[in-house]
Structure formats: structure tokens, C-alpha cells
């Protein structure tokens, strides 16, 4: 846990196996609203991961500062095909700031989708 009010958690789960576990864990979270700052790299099966994401969350799609990162707009477009709406942000810092501004004390913010996303978050947002 990175912050307590609102709760902010990050995780490096970045593939289907990781998200099978993470989606179960996120399903147990008690909060008013869940916010997910999410990005992935281009060599992962994003469609299968998107199927596992909690549909009730607010999404902030972003990309890490690495050549392997999928564009935030590509993720946003793919997510729409899976019934997930959200806004796109060019950096993890901008996505996290938007989520944090939108969150209330009883909300939950999750940052993840790739080790690079978490790395950018820890480097630039903490």
C-alpha cells in the first residue's frame, strides 16, 4: 500500500496469470469507487487481460516511458471493445493525478498492468 486515504495500491501483475489472481483480489476490495490507472506493453495478451478487469471501476489508461509500451489510446480503444470506458493520459503521472483528484477518502486507487507502469509511478508520483 502506497497511501491510506484514499487507499492506493500498485502491483506488477502484467499477464493473464497475474490478472487472474489480481481480479479476484480486486473483487474483495470494499470502497465507494475503484479507480484503475492501467497500461501494458505491446507483447502481452491485452484482450485476455481486459476481459479480467473489473468493469465497475473508473479507468485511466496510460503508457509507461518505454519503447515496449502500448499507446494509451490503443489501450483505450481495445478496452471499449470489452465494455470498459476510460480516459487516456500520455504519462503515468498525469493518469495518477487525475485518479487522485477524482477519488474521495473512501475510494481505492489501483496502479498497474505492467512493471514499467509501476516503476514510472514509484519514480514520478511518490
Predicted region positions:
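C-terminal helical cap/extension that packs against the catalytic core
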Residues: 7-8, 50-108
